[in-house]
């Protein structure tokens, strides 16, 4: 305010849209670092069957994930959120609980870290110790198929309000609640960047954008989650995350 009032002879222009678009389009060097970041997540999830096992405190699991991420080159591990449930499918995340895991536990695990160079990715999976309940498998499968649907729509020119609508139509058609928040977004030096997969977003997808997409199949009792990272290509998108969607049975 001081500058606009006291600095005469200067025209102030809102360059938010310009800067957001510059940030959203990744250069070849940025894409190289993004792939490294996504690979760190994949390597951590490859180790999860050894990390998530019976008779461990939840904080021990969190610490192991953070330590492994650091050893693999993560510069900043902004978030490791886990929540286990001994009886029913996980309904959410309660970080740093002091309970021991046991057979039959289901765990929601969200990892958000950046790799060398500071570029963020994220990955979210649900894990089970032992045989998963039927409704849990169904919810996870629905979320994974919803993610596949949205991925098939992601290409240059695709509009975020259309993606948001398609996500909710699929979830509701399969008996789950519609999404009320953003279920996808750009990534880079910030964990969440534009474009945001919400009805109000005006920025369309473009080649070399890097986005995370994380639909959730929720019905008030069960939660099924899937999250992967995608690079928008000339005529579609590339799934950069290699960890399979769906449940990880440990």
Regions found by a protein language model. Give the residues of each.
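Active-site neighborhoods and metal-handling regions in enzymes and metal-associated proteins
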Residues: 1-250
